[in-house]
């Protein structure tokens, strides 16, 4: 499952992202964040972190540097 999700994200990065433009307000970009989170924490926890990140990605959020956490703790 982890490999499948990372492959889908890479396909998005190479096929769709160039057409949509690079407008991510965060560093690393949301797709790079997703690959890192899934690679570190697996499909389920990585997807959870990615969904939380995508919910913050909107015009009213200032953005900035938002790395994947080193370890998951109580939040």
UniProtKB/Swiss-Prot annotation:
It is found in: Cell inner membrane. SMART domains: Haemolytic. It comes from the Bacteria. GO terms for cellular component: plasma membrane. The keyword Cell membrane applies. Keywords: Cell inner membrane, Cell membrane, Membrane. It is a peripheral membrane protein. Pfam families: YidD. The keyword DNA damage does not apply. InterPro entries: Membr_insert_effic_factor_YidD. Disulfide bonds: none annotated. Its main location: membrane. Could be involved in insertion of integral membrane proteins into the membrane. Belongs to the UPF0161 family. This is Putative membrane protein insertion efficiency factor. The lineage of its organism: Bacteria, Pseudomonadati, Pseudomonadota, Gammaproteobacteria, Methylococcales.
């Amino acid at each position: 499952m982890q490999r499948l999700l990372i492959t889908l994200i890479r396909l998005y990065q190479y096929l769709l992202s160039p057409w949509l433009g690079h407008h991510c307000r965060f560093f690393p970009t949301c797709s790079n964040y997703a690959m890192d989170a899934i690679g570190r924490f697996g499909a389920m926890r990585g997807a959870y972190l990615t969904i939380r990140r995508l919910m913050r990605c909107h015009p009213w959020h200032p953005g900035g540097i938002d790395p994947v956490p080193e370890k998951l703790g109580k939040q």
